[in-house]
């Protein structure tokens, strides 16, 4: 769609030039939108409107975990879905500490995914997401690179990231790489 109003609004709000990328051909076209709704409200609406799984991209691992924690009281999955998740993870060994936190998130239909996690937890989240058992995945840009997981909606909490030295604005290519996790051919057609 026409994003010229969004481009002008971003330039006005940030004082920085905005680039509009056009002409990208995708097997599953993406829709872009901007919302000022509180995040919890937006997430509940996306799940209710069958736009889950939602991948919520955070600039830091800490923010991803905090967001997942804040959503555990939301009713994202039905009782039947919760039982299906419990059956799927019944034989999985969660360590104490962060492992029990991951388990709590998963049973609420929430995944967490970032580079600081043990690979076994990241693989579990990826497997559950591929099975359609998770409604929301909170993470950094790690899920946005090289992993084929069915994501219907990508929600950015910020258009910045820490690059190891400083926090900077995402490059257009990085934004499109992460946003492109939604609408994957073969998963969401």
Write out the residue ranges for each language-model feature:
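Conserved C-terminal RecA-like helicase domain
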Residues: 61-136, 167-173
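Short gly/pro/ser/thr-enriched loop/turn and capping motifs at secondary-structure boundaries
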Residues: 27-28, 64-65, 145, 161-164, ...
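Conserved interdomain linker/interface between the two RecA-like ATPase lobes of SF2 helicase motors
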Residues: 1-75, 104-115
């Amino acid at each position: 769609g026409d994003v010229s109003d969004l481009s002008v609004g971003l330039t006005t709000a940030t004082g920085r030039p905005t680039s509009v990328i056009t002409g990208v051909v995708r097997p599953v076209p993406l829709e872009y939108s901007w919302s000022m709704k509180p995040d919890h409200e937006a997430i509940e609406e996306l799940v209710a409107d069958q736009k889950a799984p939602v991948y919520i991209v955070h600039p830091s691992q800490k923010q991803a975990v905090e967001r997942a924690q804040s959503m555990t009281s939301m009713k994202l999955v039905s009782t039947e879905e919760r039982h299906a998740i419990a059956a799927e993870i019944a034989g999985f060994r969660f360590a104490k500490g962060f492992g029990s936190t991951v388990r709590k998130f998963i049973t609420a239909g929430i995944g967490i995914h970032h580079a600081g996690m043990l690979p076994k937890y990241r693989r579990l989240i990826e497997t559950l997401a591929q099975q359609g058992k998770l409604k929301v995945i909170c993470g950094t840009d790690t899920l946005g690179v090289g992993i084929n997981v069915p994501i219907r909606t990508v929600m950015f909490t910020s258009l910045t990231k820490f690059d190891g030295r400083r926090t900077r604005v995402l490059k257009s290519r990085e934004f499109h790489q992460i946003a492109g996790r939604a609408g994957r051919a073969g998963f969401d057609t």
